[in-house]
Amino acid sequence: MICHRMNKYLVLNILSFFIIVTLCASCGSRKTAGGEQGDTLLMRHAQLLQMVDFGSYTEVSVQNPWHKGQLLHRYFLVKKGAEPDESSLRQRGTVVRVPLTHTVAFTTVHASLLQQLHAESALAGMADVEYVHSPSLKQLCKSGKIVNVGSSLSPDVERIIALQPDAMFLSPFDNSGGYGKVGELGVPVIECADYMESTALGRAEWIRFYGLLTGREHLADSIFRQVETNYQELCRKASQTKTRPTLLMDKLTGSVWYVPGGKSTLGSMLRDAAVSYVFADDTHAGSVALPFEKVLEQGSTATLWLLRYESPLLDTYTLQTLLSEYHGYARMKAFQHGQCYGCDTRSSLFYEEVPFRPDLLLSDFITLAHPELQLGSSRYFIRLPQ
C-alpha cells in the first residue's frame, strides 16, 4: 500500500513538472499555422504591439486602437538574404525586407526617431519639412539629400514614385478611409499607431519595432532600457511628495481648447508626475476639443498652467501676450498668480524628442510641480514673464 501511494505521488510530481515546463515554454514561444516555432519578444509596456521572432523573419502584429480585439496590420520583417516562403507570408500580411534603406516619413516624429537610431541615411523623403526643428535634419532637407514630398495631407505622389522607397511611415487615423493614392503604390505602409498607446512608456517602447525595421534593434533596446530606468526613477521620486498641485494644459486654438485626454500618454504622464490633472477623469486616449467655458469650469482654480505655443518671430512670449490672445485667461487662478509656464514648440525639439524620450518631459512636469525635489532646471517649459 505504501509503495502504491509513493508511486502515485511520484507520477503526480512528474506530471506536474511537465505541465509547468510546457506552460513556461508556451509563454515565450508561438507556432505558425505551418508549425514554425517562434520566440515572442516580450513587450513590457506597449499594448498595441506583438512581435514574434521566427529566425529568418519577425512577425509584428499591430492591434487596432479604435476597435478592441481587431488587427490593424500584420507585418513580416524578412531579413535580406533570408528565403522564407514569401508567397505564404504575403497571404497573411505585408512583407517588409529589412533593414530599410530608402524610406519616406510623413511625420517629423518618425524622421527624428530615425535620427535617434543613427539611421537617418535611410530617410530618402519627408513630408511637412517646414516643421523640422532638428538642425541636422534641416540641413539634409536643404541640401536635397532628403526630398520634400509636400504636405502629409496632400503629398506629391510623383515625387514619392520617383524615390522608389522601400517603405513609408504614416500615422493611421480612425475612419480615415485609407491612404488614398499613396496607399495604392505597392510600397509597404508602416502604420505608426504608437501615439495611441495609453502610457508614455508604452509609446516609447515602439522604438524596438522601429529598431527592427532599420537594423538597429540592439541600439533601440538599449535606448528604451535607459528611458525606462530614468522614467521609473522619476516616478518613484514624485510618488514620495506630499503635495498634489492641480494642473491645466495648453490653451485655445481658435475657439476650441484641445486638452490631453485622461487616458492619453500625456494624461498618464501627469499622473506619474504626482499632480492633480483637471481632466484626469476623462476617458479619451487622444486630445479632447472643449469650449473655453468648459475648461474654465473645471480648470479655473488650477494652481499650475503649462501651455505650448509657437512664436513665429521668436519674440518673448509673456503673460500679456497670452492675455492679448483671449481676455478670458485673466479668470484663471494660475494666470493671476503668475504660475504659467510655456514651451515654444517652434524653437525647441519638443515634438521630435518627447514621443520616444518621455523621461525628459516627465522631468519637466515634476520639476515645475515639485520644486522641493530640486531636479534642476526644466528643459522645455519656462515661466512666462509679465
Please annotate each region the language model reported.
Residues M1-G34:
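Bacterial Sec-dependent N-terminal signal peptides
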Residues H67-I161, L170-P172:
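A short, structured surface patch at a secondary-structure boundary
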